[in-house]
UniProtKB/Swiss-Prot annotation:
This is Arginine--tRNA ligase. CDD domains: Anticodon_Ia_Arg (cd07956), ArgRS_core (cd00671). The lineage of its organism: Bacteria, Bacillati, Cyanobacteriota, Cyanophyceae, Synechococcales. A motif ('HIGH' region) lies at residues 143-153. It catalyses: tRNA(Arg) + L-arginine + ATP = L-arginyl-tRNA(Arg) + AMP + diphosphate. It comes from Prochlorococcus marinus (strain MIT 9211). Keywords: Aminoacyl-tRNA synthetase, ATP-binding, Cytoplasm, Ligase, Nucleotide-binding, Protein biosynthesis.
Amino acid sequence: MRNIYLALNQHICGALEAAFPQASLVAKQSGQSLNPQLVPATKPEFGDFQVNGALALSKILKKAPRKIAEEIIKQLVKNDDFNKLCLKPEIAGPGFINLTIQNSCLTTEICARLNDDHLGVPIAKPLKTHKSLKPIVVDFSSPNIAKEMHVGHLRSTIIGDSIARVLEFRGHPVLRLNHVGDWGTQFGMLITYLKLVAPEALTTANAINLGDLVKFYRQAKKLFDEDETFQDASREEVVRLQNGDPQSLKAWQLLCDQSRIEFEKIYKRLDIHITERGESFYNQYLQDVIDDLKSTNLLVTDNGAKCIFLDDITGKDGKPLPLIVQKTDGGFNYATTDLAAIRYRLQAYPQGDGACRLIYVTDAGQASHFFAVFQVARRANWIPNDCRIEHVPFGLVQGEDGKKLKTRSGDTVRLKDLLDEAIIRAKNDLEERLNAEGRKEDQEFINKVSRVIGIAAVKYADLSQNRITNYQFSFNRMLALQGNTAPYLLYALVRIAGINRKGGSLNATINKLTFNEPQEWMLARELLKFDEVILQVEEELLPNRLCNYLFELSQVFNRFYDQVPVLKANDSLKASRLALCQLTADTIKLGLKLLGIPTLDRM
């Protein structure tokens, strides 16, 4: 109801100004305004919206809150445009104003949504100071080369993808960046080891697979920790790599390519589109970071290392802790690379990306790192006043025992294995259901539905949780046909598709709707919340808000369909009820698309 909200807010602000002209003038002179605090109603009995500002305004206006509410209403009811929009306002409690939208306005909005691919969600507009929208960077997924993607990467990948989808839907240009770990001392160690045990992997494409590469990496790490001679050789290899030695660079590129092949298989299964821009991309800018920090007098040399001390970050003794950006041996670290990335991403195009908002989707364990890096970037004046930079943290994936999800042998769960298991279980559930119903379906149907349900269940189970908290992974819960799950929502869509098939297609344009049952109005009101939910997700970066809305919408629809005849209704009511069915399907389908979840016509 964004359009209705904006119109209401304008009317109420006008009423406040008319009721209290002197106070409004004083507020304007100080660059402020009297805030009516218009918000969506918390319960249906409070109407559609509530004006909660009377309590706060009582301190400014030196009047009782109810008296303020009465004065606001007195001005509102003089306004014909307001009366067309709203029923007569009611005062509740100490001075809250409850507002209920006219039925005619609700049906007009529903008609508009039926003919709008965006379902009422407004397209983002640039700031007054900009001619066009500036890019938003969403940094997510970010696996490490020579390591397999595990369950921890699932959260970053699908949360980041969903955030990017919502921002793109709003019309923002989005840079989906995969900050892969493709540089560092581990490559010197791995290349040195492969020269000993599998030299062909350093000269020939696809000589080994990622699984072998992971094993070699573990063996190389063990040898590195135990053998000083191997350590020295590894460090020499790192120097050759950093100096651009052709053979070392070729070996490094082959290792990256091999890992990339496996990453792409996962991304394809999850329908993830992302641009790789790894740590190595920023190597050329690392010295610029040091020079910049030096010119702003932020750098301090401490025990031979170059670092920045931040007052906001202290040790147990209360003293400031340093953020090291150049080690004693002259090498750089993750902090330097992340600072270079921030600097590049915010620099105006073509020197950089020219972004206006940076969003980093990583586990909560990196919160202190990003807090420090962001502080340095601000103190270096790299972040313009009209830009936002945010860390989007998420919790752990736990087993049903409440501990970090592991395999039986204690290893980290590979993402590939987890997705395979989800599809197998979805297939078993589907075949059991088909047998119980006596339905015959071909193998192509069974395989397709199993893939969609399996992947959808895994993604939705994660996205439906508040990302900030840990969550317990359970195949049984996520594949259930009841509760806040992907199968429940997919089944709701299939059910509506069946209704629409039986009821026939709607007219191309519907200009008038007739509702006479409480369940119809309840469904209409729920459908009109979609635009506000999307705007909320864009601001808060919490995809679970959208999941909760879709689940609530599907429940409201089921109550409507169970209690109100649709296909058996007379023609004047049938078209309106089919329109509600169609808009519900469109809303759920679009919502799931923004979550990165595929849908089905049949299950």
